[in-house]
Structures are given as structure tokens and as C-alpha cells.
Regions:
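Conserved structural core of kinase catalytic domains
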Residues: 57, 65-68, 78-96, 100-146
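Activation segment
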Residues: 51, 120, 180, 187-191
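C-lobe/activation-segment region of protein kinase-like
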Residues: 175, 185-216
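Conserved hydrophobic alpha-helix
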Residues: 95, 150-157
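Catalytic-loop of the protein kinase fold
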Residues: 158-169
Length: 216
């Protein structure tokens, strides 16, 4: 006797996520400038515009850099507000187009944007600064190995004709596959400085943020 063949009903494709709608909803209620959410099977971040910043302190720092003849210390304004959001979205998209590891921008509007987490869902992505600090008990070779990885990650950006915003070790993150990624782009040094000075600024930021560990 021929028995009927019972098959499981076909599962249709998962509905596409409306990132723009999710962003619009969260910006209406989110209290913090940046917050993380689970959205389907991925983790995302919503970054909203903060209070605009004044220019007074940047003018003072600029005058000091000019007085001492140190153009590499010329301040790069972070104006906050919607301008900082637009700057970060533009910079993330530009660096991604250059093949560099940065968070993917999923949706954006004037007062905020949505980006994908640089790592596995529900897992923190450690910064290189955290890794270097944790390596101190293991000795100078372990610290130097991580420090050189950060330096090479910055060099990779420079070789692509770009620069970072604040190249502190805390803004270099270790992705699950071992690649060093880059975060925090609320300002654009290339808008106010020649590229060679931007590269020098990156080197100074990285050296400043890691000097305490190299001394040990």
C-alpha cells in the first residue's frame, strides 16, 4: 500500500528587518546617547545626537597650538548634536568603503543612526586598551605584541589614505575573528588638517593612551 508522503511545510524567508523604522522608534524613547539592542538574531547600537558643543575651548587650544608652533596639536572640533551624527555616519561609510573594519551603518536620520555591533550578539568586543592592560602581568613581550598590533591597525588606515578620529587604544577593538576594528568617529580631522598631520595626530593619540603600559 502506498502511504502518503508527509512533508514539513516550507518555511518562508524571514521577514526583512526595517532598520529605519526601528531607529525612528528608538530615538523617540531612548534616554542615553548610545544604547545596545537585540534585533532579530543580531545586536545593534542606536546612537542619538547629544547636546551641541560650543567652539570656545577649541579656539583656546588652537591659539596655544599656534603659539607653540605645534600644528599637529591643532584641535579638531567635535560640535556634537546633529553635526556629530552626520560626521560619524559619513566617516563610517567612507572607511567601510575603503575595506576597513568599522561598524556597519544600517539606518540614519538627522538626530541619530543605527549600526551593527562589531562582534557576536550578547558578547562584548574588548578594546585593545583593555587587552593591553590585562597583558601587563604576563610581561613586556605580551604587552609589546598587542601594542604592535594596534600600531599596524593604524598603519592600515593610513595606507588607505585615511585617518582615525581619536586613535586611542580604547577606540581600537578586537573582533571575534582577531581583526582589529575601529570605533568613535564624531569628528573629522581631515576637515581641518592636512593628511600628514592627521597621521601624526593618530600616532600621538595612540602613544599617549598606551604610554603607561609601555613604561611597565
Amino acid at each position: 500500500m502506498n502511504l502518503p508522503v508527509i512533508t514539513e511545510p516550507l518555511q518562508g524567508p524571514a521577514p526583512a528587518v526595517d532598520y529605519a523604522a526601528f531607529l525612528a522608534r528608538q530615538l523617540q524613547t531612548q534616554q542615553f546617547n548610545a544604547a545596545s539592542y537585540r534585533l532579530g538574531d543580531e545586536q545593534v547600537w542606536v546612537k542619538r545626537a547629544n547636546t551641541p558643543h560650543g567652539m570656545a575651548r577649541y579656539r583656546v587650544l588652537g591659539a596655544l597650538a599656534l603659539l607653540f608652533g605645534l600644528p599637529v596639536l591643532q584641535p579638531v572640533p567635535n560640535l556634537g548634536g546633529n553635526i556629530a551624527i552626520a560626521t560619524e555616519v559619513q566617516r563610517l561609510r567612507d572607511l567601510a568603503a575603503r575595506g576597513l573594519r568599522v561598524p556597519t551603518v544600517l539606518a540614519a536620520q538627522d538626530d541619530g543612526f543605527l549600526m551593527r555591533h562589531l562582534g557576536r550578539p550578547a558578547e562584548q568586543t574588548p578594546s585593545l586598551g583593555t587587552e593591553i592592560e590585562a597583558a601587563v602581568p604576563a610581561g613586556p613581550e605580551a604587552v609589546l605584541r598587542l601594542w604592535v598590533q594596534g600600531l599596524r591597525a593604524i598603519e592600515l588606515v593610513h595606507n588607505q589614505g585615511a585617518c582615525l578620529s581619536q586613535a586611542f587604544a580604547r577606540n581600537l577593538v578586537r573582533c571575534p575573528d582577531g581583526v582589529v576594528g575601529y570605533v568613535d568617529f564624531e569628528d573629522d580631522p581631515m576637515a581641518v588638517l592636512p593628511l600628514p598631520l592627521c597621521h601624526g595626530r593618530d600616532a600621538l593619540c595612540y602613544a599617549h593612551s598606551t604610554a603607561i603600559y609601555l613604561r611597565q
